[in-house]
Design a protein with these regions (language model features):
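Long, charge-rich boundary regions
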Residues: 56-129
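A structural preference for short, pocket-lining loop segments at secondary-structure junctions
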Residues: 113-123, 139-163
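N-terminal alpha-helical interaction blocks
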Residues: 1-16
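Glycine-rich anion/phosphate-binding loops
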Residues: 99-105, 130-145
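Cys/His-rich microdomains that often coordinate metals
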Residues: 34-35, 53-54
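Short cysteine-rich clusters marking metal-coordination/redox-active sites
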Residues: 28-31, 47-50
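Residues immediately within or flanking Cys/His clusters that coordinate Zn2+
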Residues: 25, 44
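Conserved catalytic cores of soluble enzyme domains
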Residues: 158-276
Length: 287
């Protein structure tokens, strides 16, 4: 006779293990907050915990600012050559194009913002750090020329480490070329709005980025010409905390406003209507 008896209970079916896709969650690189990747996307790549503004791709920013179904891209066939015969530059261009899915570090397009036509250039940091070479300069110059011809306001969204060293002086020439055509916009009283995102540095900050009739910046964006270590070594003294952030520049009169990404389209729409003398569209007058 057995001392112990095991009750025979009906076995429960084993639940199928839930497979979570590896890209279902995302992590903020500022505060470390982990959340659903979909939540970051819905929040325009702004951390729901600390409000850190992550970098956007150029095509993503176009869809944020332009009215639905109005985007017409320009000069997508322009590609950088290798005029100086810089070692491995063609290979770097091919790698950057394959990785970023773009032909160079800027997208230019025409569309409608709050019902008003506008030309926009959006720099893409994913392509060689958003560096400004001959193609970037040419596309901005052509876009500004379109604004001159059609009297459309111009917007340029900057995200760049500066001039592209592989093109040497030809890259530096773009600063003067773009600045010259922007001066023509000023003479014709055609609005130019510059939007600074993280980072906006080097030759870009020394040219078109700081020439806007209105200069807006995203929160926490790093904006400056040289890096803090270079400046500290040159001056031989300590620098103020956060002296290259958009908030610091706002306090010292270098930018006109720091605008949250979710409010950028509304603010730009209000600026365009104010500059053009047109009344605010329905639903856009508040804020």
């Amino acid at each position: 006779m057995a001392w112990f008896r095991k009750d025979k209970k009906p076995r429960q079916p084993v639940r199928q293990r839930l497979e979570i896709p590896p890209d279902a969650f995302d992590k903020c690189d500022q505060c470390g907050h982990t959340d659903l990747a979909e939540k970051f996307v819905r929040n325009l790549e702004v951390c729901p915990n600390c409000d850190h503004h992550r970098r956007l791709r150029a095509n993503e920013y176009l869809t944020i600012l332009f009215d639905d179904g109005t985007i017409v891209e320009h000069d997508s066939d322009l590609r950088s050559a290798d005029p100086l015969g810089f070692p491995d530059y063609p290979a770097r261009l091919r790698k950057a194009s394959a990785s970023a899915g773009e032909t160079d570090a800027i997208l230019t397009a025409t569309g409608m913002i709050d019902g008003l036509p506008a030309n926009i250039g959006v720099m893409d940091f994913a392509f060689m750090g958003g560096s400004m070479g001959s193609v970037v300069g040419e596309k901005i110059a052509r876009l500004a020329q379109r604004s001159l011809e059609r009297k459309y306001p111009l917007l340029v969204i900057s995200a760049s480490g500066g001039a592209r060293m592989q093109e040497g002086v030809l890259s530096l020439m773009q600063m003067a070329k773009v600045s010259a055509v922007l001066a023509q916009l000023g003479e014709r009283r055609i609005p130019y709005i510059s939007i600074l995102t993280n980072p906006t540095t080097g030759g870009v900050s020394a040219s078109h980025a700081m020439l806007g009739d209105a200069i807006l910046a995203e929160p926490g964006a790093v904006i400056g010409f040289a890096g803090p270590r270079v400046i500290k070594q040159t001056l031989g003294q300590d620098l103020p905390e956060g002296f290259q952030t958009s908030e610091f520049l706002l306090e010292h009169g270098m930018v006109d406003d720091v605008v949250h990404r979710k409010d950028m389209k509304r603010v730009v729409g209000q600026l365009l209507r104010h500059m053009s003398g047109k009344p605010a569209a329905a639903g856009w007058a508040q804020g």
